[in-house]
Amino acid sequence: MSVVVRRSAAARRLWSWESFCQWITSTENRLYIGWFGVLMIPTLLAATFCFVIAFIAAPPVDVDGIREPVIGSLLGGNNLISAAVVPTSAAIALHFYPIWEAASLEEWLYNGGPYQLIVFHFLIGVWCYLGRQWELSYRLGMRPWIAVAFSAPAAAATAVLLVYPIGQGSFSEGLPLGIAGTFYFMLAFQAEHNILMHPASWLGVAGVFGGALLASLHGSLVISSLIRETSEEESQNAGYRFGQQEVTYNFLAGHYAFLGRLGIPSLGWRNSRSVHFWMAALPTLGIWAAAIGIGLMAFNLNGFNFNQSILDSQGRFIPTYADLLNRANLGIQAMHAPNAHHFPLLLAAKAD
């Protein structure tokens, strides 16, 4: 009798594990979880909770490592625009700095420990979300291009939050987690690396703007070439039935006939798949290029810098936009430099 009981208990445990696996990998759930979701959900929740608490009530952080803490929380006097989670202190550099590595919680907060906690958990969650997209596509029999497209913003987040601090030797150089902090990072990055003159930045701008142009063009042509299924008194939108197999707009009328007559007829699209491919490919390639550029400049492979101005045959200075850009970079570098505490000459003489 005892043998039968042990077998039934083992079978019950096996059934519960199998049911858990089926529930995790089921495509019938309202929200697909997947095995990547098992890791994604707790990491993103941890990053979100820590970010909200730090954004509201974090104490000042000695980000430059010179005993001049910077406060970024709302309770410290900031508003929603200026508030940010301040990066980990330069005194920590690239060391892994969990709570148990600090002597006290106050020390961990003073050195910007929450920034590392948020960044590491967030990046793990982002890449698990990418894996979850691939996993759901695989189980539904779809091709994996959704995950490939999402790899572009995932790579961009990894570049500014992890690769750039590693290349610069300190997490204090990472992106501050806030609105004004993001623009501060952009200005400091331009001053240090001249990203506006880097080919990867050019490719990124061309890809993102090209994708935006193509998306607005395609969307406007679709809305303008809807196939009417209703009377003149009713809206065309009322003729759509959810899940219908019939097409809802005339692709050739919009892209080939209308757009072809506005521009070059031979360049008018005849295939909707090619349009949607370029709508996905252009911004994906552009953001990939920008992420690669951040990775290159993290190790000081900077943009073009024309340090020597153009001179005419008589040696006279000819001003160009490159000179204006260099002057702007020098000005931003001066504002970005930490306070070195230069004492007045009188005090320095008395100290001697």
Curated annotation (Swiss-Prot):
Membrane-crossing residue ranges in chain numbering: 32-49, 121-136, 145-159, 200-221, 278-292
Chief place of localization: membrane
Transport is among the record's keywords: yes
Chain positions of site Stabilizes free radical intermediate: 193
Keywords: Calcium, Chlorophyll, Chromophore, Electron transport, Herbicide resistance, Iron, Magnesium, Manganese, Membrane, Metal-binding, Oxidoreductase, Photosynthesis, Photosystem II, Thylakoid, Transmembrane, Transmembrane helix, Transport
Residues binding chlorophyll a: 121
Posttranslational modification: Tyr-164 forms a radical intermediate that is referred to as redox-active TyrZ, YZ or Y-Z.
Gene Ontology terms: cellular component: photosystem II; plasma membrane-derived thylakoid membrane
Binding site for Fe cation: 218, 276
Pfam families linked to this entry: Photo_RC
UniProt keyword annotation of Transferase present: no
Annotated binding of pheophytin a, by residue: 129
Annotated site, Tyrosine radical intermediate, chain positions: 164
Coiled coil spans: none
Catalysed reactions, semicolon-separated: 2 a plastoquinone + 4 hnu + 2 H2O = 2 a plastoquinol + O2
Positions annotated as propeptide: 349-352
GO BP term, example: response to herbicide
EC number(s) stated in the UniProt entry for this protein: 1.10.3.9
Membrane topology: Multi-pass membrane protein
Subunit structure: PSII is composed of 1 copy each of membrane proteins PsbA, PsbB, PsbC, PsbD, PsbE, PsbF, PsbH, PsbI, PsbJ, PsbK, PsbL, PsbM, PsbT, PsbX, PsbY, PsbZ, Psb30/Ycf12, peripheral proteins PsbO, CyanoQ (PsbQ), PsbU, PsbV and a large number of cofactors. It forms dimeric complexes.
HAMAP family attached to this UniProt entry: PSII_PsbA_D1 (MF_01379)
Other known facts: Cyanobacteria usually contain more than 2 copies of the psbA gene. 2 of the reaction center chlorophylls (ChlD1 and ChlD2) are entirely coordinated by water.
Name this polypeptide is given: Photosystem II protein D1 2
Organism: Synechococcus sp. (strain JA-3-3Ab) (Cyanobacteria bacterium Yellowstone A-Prime)
Gene that encodes the chain: psbA2
